[in-house]
Amino acid sequence: MRRAIAGDGRGRDGLIQGPVAGLQERTMTQNSSTDATPGGHQLRFAHLERVITAQAGDTLFQSARRNGVRIVGACGGRGTCGTCSIHVVEGQVERSPHAAPGREPAEGRAPKKWQRACQLRALSDCTVEVAPRSLAPVVRADVAGSASAEPLPLDPLVRSLDMSVAPATLTDPAADAERLRRALPGQDLRLDLGALRELPRVLRAGSWSLSARLRGSELIGVASPGSPSLGLAVDLGTTNVAAFLIDLQDGRRMASLAIENPQAAWGADVISRVNHAVAPAGGDELRQAAITAINALAHDLCRAVDAVPADIVDVAVCGNTAMQHLLLGLPVFQLGRAPFVAAAGQGMDVKARELGLAVCPGAYVHVAPSVGGFVGGDHVSALLATRDLWAGATTSLVMDIGTNTEISLIHEGRILSASCPSGPALEGGHISCGMRAAEGAIERVGLADDGSLTLKVIGKKAPVGLCGSGVLDVMAALHRAGMADDRGRLNAEHPAVSVRDGKRAARLAEGVSFSQDDVRAVQLAKSAIRTGVELLLREAGLQSGDIARFIIAGAFGAYIDIRSGIDTGLLPQLPLERFAQVGNAAGLGVQRMLACGREREQAAEIAARCRYVELSTLAGFQKAFMQHIGFDTSMKATQ
C-alpha cells in the first residue's frame, strides 16, 4: 500500500525536480571569478558555465565546494568513497600530498579520464568536467504543489492584526510604543527590541496604520497593513533540507523546496559530522552551513510567492538529535560516545536572530522534542504525522529510513524507539555508481525471463548511474539471478560478473556496475535496520508477524519496492497490504507543529511516551546483526 503523506512536496529521493535559482546559484554569484585569490588557479566548469578560483593548498573538491559547485562527496572529501568523479579536460594537476588510498571511480570508466576530485590539486588553470552521477542536483520551488493535500490544523501561535494607531501630535506626543499599547488595551504588551526598532518607520510609512505580529502578549514584528503572515517549516535532514512555506492566516501550503544539506561537505553520515564538530571551529562551520541553507530556502520560497523573508513570523524545525544540536550550536562531543546523551531533549523556542535566521526580527524558532540517542525531533514529527495510521492498530511499527534510520514499535500504548546508523548506501551514497535521482539514473531493476537484468532509467536516457530507489532492486535481482549467493558474494563464473584487480563487479549497463564493495555496503545497511526491528520486537515480546501496520516514512522509503525490501531481508515477510509508504512524514509533522500550537503539545506527549532503546546494549545484538547480513532464500514477498 502506498499512501502519500500530505504536503510531501518532493520528487524522487526527496528532491523536487528541475533547475532553481537557490542556494547554489546565490553562492555562485557571491564567489565569482572576479574575487580571485592571489596566486590561485582558475577552474573552469564549462558544462556548468562556472569559473572559480582554487585557493592555495585546496583540492579540486574543496575548491568546488567552497565556491558553490556542488560535487557529491559522500565521505566529505576524505578519499574513501570514490563518488566525486571528475575529468580534467585541460590543465595540470597533482595528487594531493594528503591524498588517502581509497576507492577509485566506478569500474567501466577509463581510469585515466575519471579521477577523484578530493585527491587532486591544481598546478595551473584547468578545465574540469564533473561526472553526471557526481553532480549534486539543484531544485525548484514547488509553488502551491500540495493543494490537494489534507488541510493543516490551524491554531498558530502568531497572529497578525491590521490596526490603526492615533497619530502623534504636539498636544499628545506619547511614544510610539505607548500609542500602540493604547490601541491594544488589556494586552500587557511586551515589545521585542527588533520590532521596536521597526515601529517608527512602519507607523509613519503606513499613515499610522500597521500590521502587528503578536505571539501571545509579545509584539514580535510590525509590517504594513495587508502584509502576509507566513510560517516556515524545516525538515533538517542529514542528506537533504526541505522547507515548506505556510500561510498562517488560512493554513494554505504556499510553496515547498528541498536542497542538499551543505553539511555533506564534511561527510554524508552523522558520525562524520559529529567528529568534525569537535575539531576547532568545526561546530561553527556546520552550524553556519545549516543556517545558510535555511536562509536560502526562506529567500527562494518567499520570492516564489512574491513575499519577503521578513513576512515569516514563525519557524519550526525538526531533525535528528545531532542535526538539531548543530543548528542550535549545542555541543555534540557527548553524542559521539556512549551513552550518547543529548544536551537537551525537550522542545524549545529560541529567537530566530540568535541563530542568524533572516526572518521577522522577533520571530521564534520552535525546535521539535527528541526521544534519546539519535532518535530526534524528525522521528517525533513523523510519529505525529502518522498517528492516525498507527494509533488504530494493536501493534504498529514506524520506520523512517535514511542515513540515520529511526524505528518505533507501538504496542498497546507503549512506544519503544531506537536508531540504526544505516549510512547512505541505500540512498545511493558510498555506492561506486551511485547518484541522485536525475536523468540517466537507474531507478528500477528487474529480472527478465531469460535471467538478464531489466532497467528503468529516469528520462529514458542512457544509464550513467544508480539512484537510491534502484539499490534494493539491484540486490534482489542479483540474488534471484544467481549473480550473488546467500552470503552476498558475487559469482565470478557468471558472464555478467567481471573480476578486475581481484575485485568483482556485476555489469548493469555500459560504464555502470555494482561492485562487491557495493554489495557489502548494502548488506551492512539493511542488516543494521532489520536488526533494529527484530530487537525491538524481542524487547516487547513480539514476533514480526504481530505487526499489523508497518509504516515506512522518508523520501527514500516512498520509492523502494516493498518486494525488493522483503527479498533482500531489509523488511520482514509480511503481506504487502500491511505496509504503508507515506513519504516525508517528518516534513508533514513539522508543518503541523508550525500551524498549530496544540500539535506541539501532542508532539511533546508522544516524545514523553517513547522509551529509547540502545540496541548495542541488548543481548544478542551481534548475533542478530550477523544473522541478517546474508540473503535468506526463504524470504519472498507475498500478496
Positions of PLM-derived features:
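Acidic, glycine/GT-rich loop-and beta-edge segments that sit at the periphery of enzyme/chaperone cores
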Residues: 39, 114, 129, 133-168, ...
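Phosphate/ATP-binding catalytic cores across multiple sugar-kinase/actin-like superfamilies
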Residues: 293-305, 379-386, 523-545
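Fe-S ferredoxin-like electron-transfer domains
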Residues: 31-34, 97-230
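N-terminal phosphate-binding loop and adjacent alpha-helix
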Residues: 262-303, 430, 442-446, 521-524, ...
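Catalytic phosphate/nucleotide-handling subdomain of diverse soluble enzymes
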Residues: 411, 542-606
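Immediate flanking context of iron-sulfur cluster ligation sites
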Residues: 58-82, 89-117
